């Protein structure tokens, strides 16, 4: 089964490393959506010999992503991760949710 993946914070260190791991491990990606802040929108990131354009986090429909890797900071995680989780599985890297008992 191939999976639609979104990466929030795709141009930062954690986002770039996530892209690298997905490629190196040959993760079965169907569509890769790269999302970031407005300052990074329009940039291109290479994944499996294709240039993928970075899109706006604010404008993305997370129903398109089966899994979302949230590679942005705690402030954004607090606001965005719960919204995204309504439509996509969220794997969140910041420290914001670490002390929450009901987070798995």
Residue ranges of model-derived segments:
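N-terminal Rossmann-like NAD(P) cofactor-binding subdomain of oxidoreductases
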Residues: 1-104
